[in-house]
Swiss-Prot record:
Annotated Mg(2+) binding sites: E65
The organism of origin for this protein: Pyrobaculum neutrophilum (strain DSM 2338 / JCM 9278 / NBRC 100436 / V24Sta) (Thermoproteus neutrophilus)
UniProt catalytic activity: XTP + H2O = XDP + phosphate + H(+); ITP + H2O = IDP + phosphate + H(+)
Residues given in the record as substrate binding sites: E65, A66
Coiled-coil ranges (or none): none
GO molecular function: ITPase activity; metal ion binding; nucleotide binding; ribonucleoside triphosphate phosphatase activity
Keywords from the named record: Hydrolase, Magnesium, Manganese, Metal-binding, Nucleotide metabolism, Nucleotide-binding
Protein name per UniProt: Probable inosine/xanthosine triphosphatase
Domain of life: Archaea
Note on cofactor: Binds 1 divalent metal cation per subunit; can use either Mg(2+) or Mn(2+).
Cofactor(s) this protein cannot do without: Mg(2+); Mn(2+)
Classification via InterPro entries: ITPase-like_fam, Non_canon_purine_NTPase, NTPase/PRRC1, YjjX_NTPase
């Protein structure tokens, strides 16, 4: 299966490869540019989901041979009076079906929160604070906060895997859209 991901970030490309492999789905993953209209730091659950969906549809449109387009978006949401960083993945197909998955979320450090809510990318803030370049292309802020025990790749893989769950053949009877999905 040919799969396109709307990101040039090797971390996201690898996450898509690993998620498909997890379910035994042979996939050749290519990367395309993300849509230019996306904000650097989406705030609010609907904005994060919309970003993932927009990326997935853009990937499918940009890679004419792809059967699936994948979008991975991380952003801030409020829950329980706290602000969390969550990763959302969307998988779109040529039949128009879009499925969603979420990765684990973690509480955004207080020292970054004000800037994040103003739209500054969390990865940029982490780079400045920790003095490391290209954090989002490597371990992510979660990797820095957990001293490498949990990485951005881990969050991305889980999000994409969860977006694939409704598409697994074993789940065909559980989802109403299955008969119309390729």
């Amino acid at each position: 299966m040919k799969v396109a991901v709307a990101s040039r970030n090797p971390n996201k490309v690898r996450a898509v490869e690993e998620a498909y492999r997890l379910f035994g789905i042979p996939a050749r993953v290519s990367s395309v540019d993300k849509p230019p209209s996306l904000p650097p730091q989406p705030v609010g659950l609907e904005a994060v989901v919309a970003g993932a969906v927009e990326r997935a549809k853009a990937a499918l449109a940009a890679a004419g041979e792809a059967e699936h387009g994948v979008g991975i978006e991380a952003g801030a949401l409020e829950a329980g009076g706290r602000h969390l960083d969550v990763t959302v993945a969307a998988v779109a197909d040529r039949g128009g079906l879009v499925t969603l998955g979420f990765g684990p979320a973690f509480q955004i450090p207080d020292v970054f929160l004000g800037d994040v809510l103003r739209g500054v990318e969390l990865g940029v803030l982490a780079e400045r604070h920790f003095g490391k370049a290209a954090v989002g292309y490597r371990e992510g802020i979660i990797g820095l906060l957990t001293r490498g025990r949990v990485t951005r790749l881990d969050l991305n893989v889980v999000a994409v895997a969860m977006a694939l769950v409704p598409r697994l053949p074993a789940n065909a009877q559980l989802y109403r859209f299955w008969k119309t999905a390729p």
